[in-house]
Amino acid sequence: MYPSVDIIIPYYKRRDLLERSLDSLEQTIYPAMSIIVVDNGGTEAGLVFLVKRYRNARLVRLPENRGYAGGCNEGLKNSSADYVVFMNDDTEHDPLWLEHLVRAALDDDRIGALQPKILSLNPYKKGKKIFDYAGAAGGMIDRLGYPWCLGRTFSGVETDNGQYDRGQDIFWASGVAMFVKKSVAEELGGFDEDFFMHMEEIDLSWRMKLAGYRVRSVPSSVVFHEGGASLPGGSPEKIYYNHRNNVTMLLKNRSAAALLWLLPLRLLLDIAASVFYLTQFPGGIKKSGAVFRALAFNIRGFSAIMKKRRTVQSSRVVDERTIFRHVPISLFYRR
């Protein structure tokens, strides 16, 4: 008996990407897989007919764009599977990608989330195995709250030479292809929809770890991703969501003692980042302003964030020292 798996794909106005991804998923070798496409506020009449072309695929339509987080949560509500995979619509897949993930999940009852190896799609088509920026071989974080990945630091990505081909515990699983035990996602309330997009998977992974679940990489499972196809890297909107959601995530999940030293330092670092963005052309003023917009969001929403924090901290079963035992102080000085 194979555990059932629903692939949940939030979709927003890129039919060419979705069609390519669904074509690839059709080649997946797994007998108990279904697909849920969540249309985030779109009005494309042809989307219904597109989804009907694929076996075991169905469409859920939302009246408004609720972002990646909201689309995934709606898919979760419509799923009755044992496991779900939250997946970007600009992906392609090795035929055995899902079987490897299911096997890894069945080996350990404490698994909350798993991440496949994520390679960059376009270089792969040219014969180059390069890790994808958005997840690579597994998500990590430093003690200042800056995320990085095995196989990627800052904007630099490594060639996949098998250096991360042993599965290991990671800090977060990428939302490009995030395999999750459905009961765990429901227990934790799914994604925080106030994130809208960017870093919501880090927040959910962090809450899983606080609740005592494991997050691991499964490098035998391979997914290919066309990074930046939905929102270009370096855009003011991407800068805004990354800075905004990173601070929200810290406020929710870090200990009170850590926040006493971390928040003043992060304020200084964000101001420094805004000055750096001013030197960029074109669009430096908008990029710099995005940092202050992010800061303003967290100030205005501080009370609501603290309410979420109380919920997270009241249910945690793993202490701060255990969570950060192998986490570097800064990715500048990681060993």
Describe the role of every protein-language-model region.
Residues 23-32:
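Short, acidic, metal-binding catalytic loop of nucleotide-sugar glycosyltransferases
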Residues 24, 39-48, 64, 94:
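A conserved acidic beta->alpha catalytic loop
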Residues 32-41, 60-62:
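Short beta-strand/loop segment that forms part of the nucleotide-sugar
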Residues 62-79, 89, 100:
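Glycine-rich, basic loop-to-helix element that forms the pyrophosphate-binding segment
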Residues 84:
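Short aromatic/hydrophobic "clamp" motif used to bind/position activated sugar donors
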Residues 92-135, 139-146:
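Conserved donor NDP-sugar-binding/catalytic core segment of glycosyltransferases
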Residues 165, 169-222:
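A short, conserved alpha-helix in the catalytic core of glycosyltransferases
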Residues 211-307, 315, 321, 326:
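Active-site-adjacent helix/loop segment of glycosyltransferases
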